């Protein structure tokens, strides 16, 4: 039986049309997937789009469109780009897909919740809409995000956090032993550092 090899592109936000960065990433992932197939691996190559978030809602509003209509149009552009580039992905999934994505996400949520792996906490900080992430003061220059030239919003929100600490040792051993391979090596080291930092 052939060794399994899983590869994915990032799932970009559909707040704008695809850009050269996504094309480059898709081509790079495709090269790796094709090479692994040549080596006889059982490859599963996934791509898709992330269709949830504040910047998507804001982009749809700025375009004067319903959010669903907006994400449908933009997701199709990402999918078409992969076809035009001849990318050999096995699947393309959208996070708004109620038939495919939702059931799997809901099942995972129920499982980790049942196992006590979710912790509900209030988090507050500086939120950069462009990054769809919280940032720190040290990430800012003169109070603004350097990538988006915008001041982050001060937010306080209740969120669920995954209790990674419960699995850190097992994950670290799997990575270090090579059972779980992360390519490139710099990303492997980044993940190990993240695990070690708690």
What are the roles of these predicted feature ranges?
Residues 1-198:
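N-terminal, positively charged nucleic-acid-binding surface of large information/translation enzymes
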């Amino acid at each position: 039986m052939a060794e399994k090899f899983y590869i994915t592109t990032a799932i970009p936000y559909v707040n704008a049309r695809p850009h050269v960065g996504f094309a480059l990433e898709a081509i790079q992932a495709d090269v790796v997937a094709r090479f692994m197939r040549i080596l006889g691996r059982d490859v599963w190559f996934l791509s898709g789009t992330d269709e949830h978030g504040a910047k998507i809602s804001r982009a749809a509003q700025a375009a004067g469109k319903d959010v669903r209509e907006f994400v449908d149009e933009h997701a199709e552009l990402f999918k078409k780009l992969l076809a035009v580039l001849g990318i050999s992905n096995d699947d393309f999934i959208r996070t708004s897909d109620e038939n495919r994505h939702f059931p799997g996400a809901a099942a995972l949520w129920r499982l980790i919740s049942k196992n006590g792996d979710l912790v509900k906490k209030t988090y507050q900080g500086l939120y950069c809409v462009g990054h769809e992430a919280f940032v720190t003061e040290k990430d800012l220059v003169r109070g603004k995000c350097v990538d988006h030239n915008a001041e982050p919003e001060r937010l306080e929100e209740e969120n669920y956090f995954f209790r990674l600490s419960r699995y850190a040792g097992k994950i670290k051993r799997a990575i270090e032993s090579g059972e779980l391979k992360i390519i490139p090596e710099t990303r492997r080291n980044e993940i190990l550092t993240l695990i070690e930092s708690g």
